[in-house]
């Protein structure tokens, strides 16, 4: 595992209390007395606020519904995992041997959780302004074009237009199951056309899972 100094250089912030950073990088699989789950919970809330504020200022004439869609496109597992990869967080996470051997350092869920935890740790030690500075810089590096056309992909609407025109029917989305802790629930959605299952997807919200299932269905139709 690399020296934490390298991560702090990439982050653009040097911790006074490196124990806090270590906690943010400790996965529950280590079975240590502490893990990054509490910091992840905090970091999730902080990032939600920062991204919301950023979009509010950047898109002064955009309505609430569209801003919510933009925020959802940026505040999610995939987005946070992308930012974690930019920081090379996977190389610094403390994992059990089994989890590491199972590709844990590349898992989007683990990377996203660790990123949120690191943001939570920065917030605790340095406050909101420092987290905002780091988060906005990472957002603009990882997403150089932050606008509706580049970020918000409404696969459900696209699929519905195609199926109505070609099949005379609309897709049905069914919840297969929900699982995980209350603050990190995941939802599995099945997409059906004429009572036949076409695709399935799992995400952190029903809406995101539906969009992912619609995207998979669209990709199948192109083949």
Swiss-Prot record:
GO molecular function, one term: rRNA binding
Alphabetic keyword roster: Cytoplasm, Endonuclease, Hydrolase, Magnesium, Metal-binding, mRNA processing, Nuclease, RNA-binding, rRNA processing, rRNA-binding, tRNA processing
Residue ranges constituting the RNase III domain according to the UniProt record: 4-127
Binding positions (Mg(2+)): 40, 113, 116
Protein origin, superkingdom: Bacteria
Record note on quaternary structure: Homodimer.
This protein's name: Ribonuclease 3
């Amino acid at each position: 595992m690399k020296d934490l100094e390298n991560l702090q250089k990439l982050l653009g912030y040097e911790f006074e209390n490196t124990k806090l950073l270590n906690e943010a990088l400790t996965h529950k699989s280590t079975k240590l007395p502490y893990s990054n789950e509490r910091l992840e919970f905090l970091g999730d809330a902080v990032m939600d606020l920062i991204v919301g504020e950023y979009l509010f200022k950047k898109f002064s004439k955009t309505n609430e519904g569209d801003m919510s869609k933009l925020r959802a496109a940026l505040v999610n597992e995939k987005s946070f995992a992308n930012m974690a990869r930019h920081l090379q967080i996977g190389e610094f996470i403390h994992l059990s041997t089994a989890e590491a051997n199972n590709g844990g350092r590349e898992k989007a869920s683990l990377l996203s959780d660790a990123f949120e935890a690191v943001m939570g740790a920065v917030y605790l030690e340095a406050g909101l302004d420092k987290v905002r500075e780091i988060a906005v810089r990472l957002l603009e590096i990882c997403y150089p074009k932050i606008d509706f056309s580049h970020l918000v992909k409404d696969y459900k609407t696209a699929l519905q237009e195609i199926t109505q025109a070609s099949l005379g029917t609309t897709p049905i989305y069914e919840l297969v199951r929900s699982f995980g802790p209350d603050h990190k629930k995941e939802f599995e959605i099945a997409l059906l056309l004429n009572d036949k299952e076409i695709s399935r997807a799992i995400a952190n919200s029903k809406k995101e899972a539906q969009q992912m299932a619609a995207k998979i269905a669209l990709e199948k139709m192109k083949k």
